[in-house]
Amino acid sequence: MSDFATARQKMVDGQVRTADVTDHRILDAMLALPREEFVPQSKRALAYLDLDLDVAEAGSAPRYLVKPVLTAKLLQAAEIGPGDSVLVVGCATGYAAAVAARLAGKVNAIEGDQVLAEKGREVFSRLGLQNVAIKVAEPAAGDSADAPYDVILLNGATEVVPERLCGQLREGGRLLGVLAATRPPRATIMTRSHGDIGHRTLFDASAPVLPGLERVPAFVF
């Protein structure tokens, strides 16, 4: 077993399983997908650690793969079915989208950094993932072209209720991510029902806030 394969097994056994992730499809996907492929060569030794990993080019604004356990727990809470359409927002190089692609019928992913989006496409091609695609778009915009979605997954946090993204959910659709407007921040699921959006807290969590989903500072005289 290679060093990366050993690290992958330890990540699943030591981080993901111990966080009450029991969906075998998610565990199998994380065991199968080489997370190091989504990480710059200089940071591959960090690929399986329990941290938010900046994968942006030097000199670019930070962009992250969130902690593996957060990805796993959000995907488990999403209850993605094999026929579901999924949108991953702020995907960076696409690891969360790749895991989701093992669960869903179709996955769209959006990323504002064109260089990272292209890297993600290259990794998807190398891994033979045919039901997932990355578009260059800002996180707050979503991807209305293929809406509505059964599930929208934020690869990060939001400080505001993402109304535009919620509008791209189908009836019964779920949006999941870290709501950083609360203290402490909490992983939250938002469900569309009869045109309204309901909120339910899942667990305490933290993640970097996605670009465009920051709270606008109030003007003070």
What is the role of each PLM region?
Residues 75, 79-198:
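Conserved nucleotide-cofactor-binding alpha/beta core module
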